[in-house]
């Protein structure tokens, strides 16, 4: 497969594109992340989500530490060609590093943020940093 399809993406000045991961089947939004050209190409090639970690300044294969990989069903480009949507199967049911199903577990109610999603698994049990 040629890489010319990557040229259609409108990358940010620093070579990134915002990505929304959505759960295939339920259409629930799981998380937001960034991809660079290489991570988007790897995602398409491997069928598993590979992001660009801005904090670690490196490729981040989703689930590389936790085992909670995202199997990609579909990759879509928005109408302005500057946002990617990936439909994924979330292995293990946990997309968020906090141990929750998705990263959008805080809801604005009145004048404050309320957590409305339980922790499925303690992050200390997921990430074994030594």
Curated annotation (Swiss-Prot):
Cofactor note: Binds 1 Mg(2+) ion per subunit. Binds 1 zinc ion per subunit.
Listed cofactors: Mg(2+); Zn(2+)
Record bears the keyword Zinc: yes
Keyword list, A-Z: Amino-acid biosynthesis, Cytoplasm, Histidine biosynthesis, Hydrolase, Magnesium, Metal-binding, Zinc
Primary subcellular site in the record, as a coarse category: cytoplasm
Keyword Nuclease annotated: no
GO MF term list: magnesium ion binding; phosphoribosyl-AMP cyclohydrolase activity; zinc ion binding
Annotated InterPro entries: PRA-CH (IPR026660), PRib_AMP_CycHydrolase_dom (IPR002496), PRib_AMP_CycHydrolase_sf (IPR038019)
Residues binding Zn(2+), per UniProt: 79, 96, 103
Any one GO cellular component localisation term in the record: cytoplasm
This protein's pathway: Amino-acid biosynthesis; L-histidine biosynthesis; L-histidine from 5-phospho-alpha-D-ribose 1-diphosphate: step 3/9
GO biological process: L-histidine biosynthetic process
Cysteine disulfide links: none
Domain of life where this protein originates: Bacteria
Reactions it catalyzes: 1-(5-phospho-beta-D-ribosyl)-5'-AMP + H2O = 1-(5-phospho-beta-D-ribosyl)-5-[(5-phospho-beta-D-ribosylamino)methylideneamino]imidazole-4-carboxamide
EC number, UniProt record: 3.5.4.19
Subcellular location: Cytoplasm
Residues the entry annotates as binding Mg(2+): 78, 80, 82
SUPFAM superfamilies referenced in this protein's UniProt entry, alphabetically: HisI-like
Function: Catalyzes the hydrolysis of the adenine ring of phosphoribosyl-AMP.
Binding partners and assembly: Homodimer.
Protein family according to the UniProt entry: Belongs to the PRA-CH family.
Name the UniProt record assigns to this protein: Phosphoribosyl-AMP cyclohydrolase
Annotated source species: Methylobacillus flagellatus (strain ATCC 51484 / DSM 6875 / VKM B-1610 / KT)
Source organism phylogeny: Bacteria, Pseudomonadati, Pseudomonadota, Betaproteobacteria, Nitrosomonadales
């Amino acid at each position: 497969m040629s890489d010319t399809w990557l040229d259609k993406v409108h990358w940010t000045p620093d070579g990134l594109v915002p990505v929304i991961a959505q759960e295939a089947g339920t259409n629930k939004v799981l998380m937001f992340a960034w991809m660079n050209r290489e991570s988007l190409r790897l995602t398409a090639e491997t069928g598993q989500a590979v992001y660009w970690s801005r904090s670690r300044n490196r490729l981040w294969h989703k689930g590389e530490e936790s085992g909670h990989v995202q199997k990609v069903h579909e990759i879509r480009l928005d109408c302005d060609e500057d946002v990617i949507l990936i439909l994924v199967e979330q292995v293990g049911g946990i997309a968020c590093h906090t141990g929750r199903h998705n990263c959008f577990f805080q809801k604005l109610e009145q004048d404050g943020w309320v957590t409305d999603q339980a922790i499925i698994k303690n992050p200390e049990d997921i990430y074994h940093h030594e």
